[in-house]
């Protein structure tokens, strides 16, 4: 499958760089375009940061936030194609070291190669068949220590979640409820306690989990198509929480 990503070195991995910063800090980023075509860089819900980067060129930006948040950085050129094939990740703003990150995506396998070849796709006919968290699906996602939540009863755990795909998802927790600390789509929902979180396209949450009991509990997309890979179950957006 054709895939791009923002990486921290010249070695390609299919997991976008996870950027974390404290509230009030200034983040200085240098973004280098190692591709053969022009790309862009922007951070959602900010102004004045959008840039175009020619092949072999680079840009530098400074970003800060005075509030907790899960910001999406992405390539806005030829949107949504470049972001869809992988160029979209999370900037987590907060002050909790016990934090986890879920960058959720969906793909229609044949479309990735079609976009790579410069062909047009009709997004009204989009029907994804592969689903990932941080570039992995079940069972491999449980090996990602930045995604798989582990902890103890009474811990304060933050989960930064962003939907950087092109389909809506509904992430459901078994065993626990989470409090909403940040919602890009519905800021009025901050403070609510829920076990299911609808995530619109290119929107995000920060969730706070304080486990009240030990156990291993699943988290998955309530749209069960997203718990498959190539039509096979159980793959896709499914992982477990492990609380002691």
Language model features with spans:
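N-terminal, post-signal-peptide metal-ligating segments of extracellular/periplasmic oxidoreductases
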Residues: 1-39, 45-48, 60, 93-94, ...
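Hydrophobic beta-strand segments within beta-rich accessory/binding domains
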Residues: 29-31, 75, 160, 171
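Extracellular/periplasmic metallocenter environments
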Residues: 36-40, 45-100, 108-110, 196-244
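Short acidic, flexible loop segments centered on an aromatic residue
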Residues: 42-47, 168-179
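Generic beta-strand/beta-sheet core signal
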Residues: 105, 162, 172-174, 222
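Short, catalytically relevant binding-site loops at active-site mouths
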Residues: 108-111, 165-167, 177-178
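Long, repeat-rich segments with strong aromatic
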Residues: 150, 157-171
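Intrinsic, low-complexity N-terminal interaction/targeting segments
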Residues: 179-197
């Amino acid at each position: 499958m054709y895939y791009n990503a923002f990486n921290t070195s010249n070695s390609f991995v299919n997991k976008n760089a996870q950027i974390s910063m404290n509230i009030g800090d200034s983040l200085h980023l240098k973004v280098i375009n190692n591709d053969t075509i022009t790309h862009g860089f922007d951070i959602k819900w900010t102004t004045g940061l959008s840039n175009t980067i020619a092949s072999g060129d680079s840009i530098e930006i400074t970003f800060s936030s005075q509030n907790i948040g899960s910001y999406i950085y992405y390539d806005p050129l030829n949107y949504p194609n470049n972001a869809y094939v992988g160029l979209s990740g999370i900037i987590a703003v907060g002050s909790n070291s016990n934090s986890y990150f879920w960058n959720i995506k969906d793909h229609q396998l044949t479309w990735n190669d079609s976009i790579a070849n410069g062909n047009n796709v009709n997004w009204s006919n989009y029907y994804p068949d592969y689903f990932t968290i941080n570039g992995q699906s079940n069972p491999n996602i449980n090996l990602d220590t930045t995604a798989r939540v582990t902890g103890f009863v009474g811990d304060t755990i933050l989960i930064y979640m962003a939907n950087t795909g092109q389909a809506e998802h509904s992430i459901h927790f078994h065993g626990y409820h989470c409090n909403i600390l940040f919602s890009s789509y519905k800021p009025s929902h901050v403070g609510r306690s829920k076990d299911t979180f609808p995530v619109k396209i290119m929107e995000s949450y920060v969730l706070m989990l304080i486990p009240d009991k030990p156990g291993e509990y699943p988290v998955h997309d309530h749209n069960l198509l997203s718990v498959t890979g190539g039509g096979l179950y159980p793959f896709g957006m499914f992982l477990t929480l492990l609380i002691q």
